[in-house]
Amino acid sequence: MRIKSIYTLFVCYLAFFSCAKAPDLSETPALTLNGISKEKMKAGSVNQDSVILDIKLTDGDGDIGYVDNDTRKPDMFIIDKRTQQPYDSYILPSIPQQGINNGIIAQMKVKLYTQCCVVNPCDPDPGQADEALPLELYLVDRAGHRSNSLEINLILECKRQ
Protein backbone atom coordinates (compact mmCIF):
# COMPACT_ATOMS: atom_id res chain seq x y z
CA MET A 1 0.00 0.00 0.00
CA ARG A 2 2.81 2.38 0.91
CA ILE A 3 4.62 1.76 -2.40
CA LYS A 4 1.38 2.36 -4.28
CA SER A 5 0.85 5.74 -2.57
CA ILE A 6 4.50 6.75 -3.18
CA TYR A 7 4.10 5.76 -6.82
CA THR A 8 0.85 7.78 -7.05
CA LEU A 9 2.53 10.81 -5.44
CA PHE A 10 5.47 10.48 -7.83
CA VAL A 11 3.16 10.34 -10.87
CA CYS A 12 1.22 13.36 -9.58
CA TYR A 13 4.50 15.21 -8.98
CA LEU A 14 5.68 14.46 -12.53
CA ALA A 15 2.34 15.45 -14.02
CA PHE A 16 2.32 18.73 -12.10
CA PHE A 17 5.90 19.78 -12.81
CA SER A 18 6.21 18.44 -16.34
CA CYS A 19 3.69 20.95 -17.63
CA ALA A 20 5.74 23.92 -18.75
CA LYS A 21 4.36 27.29 -17.83
CA ALA A 22 3.31 29.16 -20.93
CA PRO A 23 5.26 32.36 -21.57
CA ASP A 24 3.37 35.54 -20.78
CA LEU A 25 3.02 37.03 -24.27
CA SER A 26 1.05 40.10 -25.29
CA GLU A 27 -1.74 39.80 -27.86
CA THR A 28 0.02 42.59 -29.74
CA PRO A 29 2.77 41.14 -31.95
CA ALA A 30 6.34 42.03 -30.99
CA LEU A 31 9.32 42.05 -33.34
CA THR A 32 13.03 41.90 -32.48
CA LEU A 33 15.78 42.37 -35.06
CA ASN A 34 18.37 39.65 -34.44
CA GLY A 35 20.64 40.52 -37.34
CA ILE A 36 21.18 41.77 -40.89
CA SER A 37 23.20 39.84 -43.48
CA LYS A 38 24.99 43.02 -44.61
CA GLU A 39 24.66 46.78 -44.21
CA LYS A 40 25.16 47.85 -47.86
CA MET A 41 23.31 47.04 -51.07
CA LYS A 42 24.22 48.01 -54.61
CA ALA A 43 21.55 50.35 -55.92
CA GLY A 44 19.64 49.12 -58.92
CA SER A 45 16.35 47.86 -60.15
CA VAL A 46 14.72 44.46 -60.33
CA ASN A 47 16.39 42.39 -57.63
CA GLN A 48 20.04 43.16 -58.43
CA ASP A 49 21.07 42.92 -54.75
CA SER A 50 19.47 42.03 -51.44
CA VAL A 51 19.91 41.76 -47.68
CA ILE A 52 18.36 39.22 -45.32
CA LEU A 53 16.84 40.30 -42.02
CA ASP A 54 16.70 37.83 -39.13
CA ILE A 55 13.61 38.70 -37.05
CA LYS A 56 12.07 37.17 -33.94
CA LEU A 57 8.26 37.34 -33.72
CA THR A 58 6.16 36.81 -30.60
CA ASP A 59 2.36 36.97 -30.44
CA GLY A 60 0.22 35.95 -27.48
CA ASP A 61 -2.81 34.80 -29.43
CA GLY A 62 -1.01 33.65 -32.58
CA ASP A 63 -3.38 35.37 -35.00
CA ILE A 64 -0.75 35.94 -37.66
CA GLY A 65 -1.40 35.75 -41.40
CA TYR A 66 -4.58 36.92 -43.08
CA VAL A 67 -7.05 34.69 -44.83
CA ASP A 68 -10.08 36.69 -45.94
CA ASN A 69 -12.45 34.55 -48.03
CA ASP A 70 -9.46 32.81 -49.61
CA THR A 71 -7.93 36.19 -50.50
CA ARG A 72 -4.55 36.82 -48.95
CA LYS A 73 -3.45 40.34 -48.16
CA PRO A 74 -0.17 41.72 -46.85
CA ASP A 75 0.39 41.77 -43.12
CA MET A 76 4.04 42.86 -42.87
CA PHE A 77 4.96 46.27 -44.20
CA ILE A 78 8.23 48.08 -44.90
CA ILE A 79 8.22 51.86 -45.27
CA ASP A 80 11.01 53.86 -46.95
CA LYS A 81 11.65 56.61 -44.39
CA ARG A 82 13.26 58.85 -47.06
CA THR A 83 9.97 59.21 -48.90
CA GLN A 84 7.46 57.85 -46.33
CA GLN A 85 6.24 55.56 -49.13
CA PRO A 86 5.87 51.77 -49.04
CA TYR A 87 9.14 49.98 -49.82
CA ASP A 88 7.69 46.48 -49.81
CA SER A 89 5.02 44.33 -48.18
CA TYR A 90 4.79 40.64 -47.41
CA ILE A 91 2.10 38.04 -46.92
CA LEU A 92 2.96 35.84 -43.97
CA PRO A 93 1.76 32.26 -43.84
CA SER A 94 -1.42 31.81 -41.82
CA ILE A 95 -0.87 30.25 -38.41
CA PRO A 96 -3.60 27.68 -37.68
CA GLN A 97 -5.49 28.54 -34.50
CA GLN A 98 -5.49 24.96 -33.27
CA GLY A 99 -2.72 24.39 -30.73
CA ILE A 100 -1.61 28.01 -30.23
CA ASN A 101 -3.35 28.68 -26.93
CA ASN A 102 0.01 29.73 -25.50
CA GLY A 103 0.84 32.04 -28.39
CA ILE A 104 3.76 31.75 -30.78
CA ILE A 105 7.45 32.53 -30.79
CA ALA A 106 8.96 32.31 -34.27
CA GLN A 107 12.06 33.22 -36.26
CA MET A 108 11.65 34.80 -39.70
CA LYS A 109 14.11 35.48 -42.49
CA VAL A 110 12.98 38.42 -44.61
CA LYS A 111 14.72 39.13 -47.92
CA LEU A 112 14.80 42.81 -48.92
CA TYR A 113 15.70 43.65 -52.49
CA THR A 114 17.51 46.79 -53.55
CA GLN A 115 16.05 49.75 -55.36
CA CYS A 116 17.30 52.85 -57.10
CA CYS A 117 18.84 55.82 -55.35
CA VAL A 118 16.68 58.92 -54.92
CA VAL A 119 19.19 61.26 -56.63
CA ASN A 120 19.79 60.24 -60.28
CA PRO A 121 17.74 57.07 -59.84
CA CYS A 122 19.28 54.05 -61.55
CA ASP A 123 21.34 56.20 -63.93
CA PRO A 124 25.05 55.38 -64.08
CA ASP A 125 26.92 58.16 -62.29
CA PRO A 126 30.41 57.30 -60.98
CA GLY A 127 30.49 60.53 -58.96
CA GLN A 128 27.26 59.92 -57.06
CA ALA A 129 27.54 59.50 -53.31
CA ASP A 130 26.08 56.57 -51.42
CA GLU A 131 22.66 57.12 -49.84
CA ALA A 132 21.28 56.17 -46.47
CA LEU A 133 18.29 53.86 -46.75
CA PRO A 134 16.32 54.09 -43.49
CA LEU A 135 13.44 51.62 -43.36
CA GLU A 136 10.64 50.93 -40.91
CA LEU A 137 9.22 47.40 -40.63
CA TYR A 138 6.05 46.43 -38.77
CA LEU A 139 3.39 43.72 -38.75
CA VAL A 140 -0.39 43.79 -38.30
CA ASP A 141 -2.19 40.69 -36.99
CA ARG A 142 -5.72 39.53 -37.86
CA ALA A 143 -7.20 41.43 -34.90
CA GLY A 144 -5.64 44.65 -36.22
CA HIS A 145 -2.94 44.88 -33.53
CA ARG A 146 0.10 46.66 -34.93
CA SER A 147 3.48 45.45 -33.73
CA ASN A 148 6.34 47.64 -32.64
CA SER A 149 8.35 49.13 -35.51
CA LEU A 150 11.85 47.98 -36.33
CA GLU A 151 14.18 50.69 -37.59
CA ILE A 152 16.56 49.30 -40.20
CA ASN A 153 19.37 51.49 -41.49
CA LEU A 154 21.02 50.36 -44.71
CA ILE A 155 23.30 52.04 -47.25
CA LEU A 156 22.64 52.11 -50.99
CA GLU A 157 25.85 52.09 -53.02
CA CYS A 158 24.88 54.52 -55.78
CA LYS A 159 28.25 54.72 -57.59
CA ARG A 160 28.45 52.61 -60.70
CA GLN A 161 31.35 52.25 -63.11
Label each region the model flagged.
Residues 15-18:
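C-terminal motif of bacterial Sec signal peptides marking the signal peptidase cleavage site
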Residues 20-23:
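Bacterial signal peptide processing site
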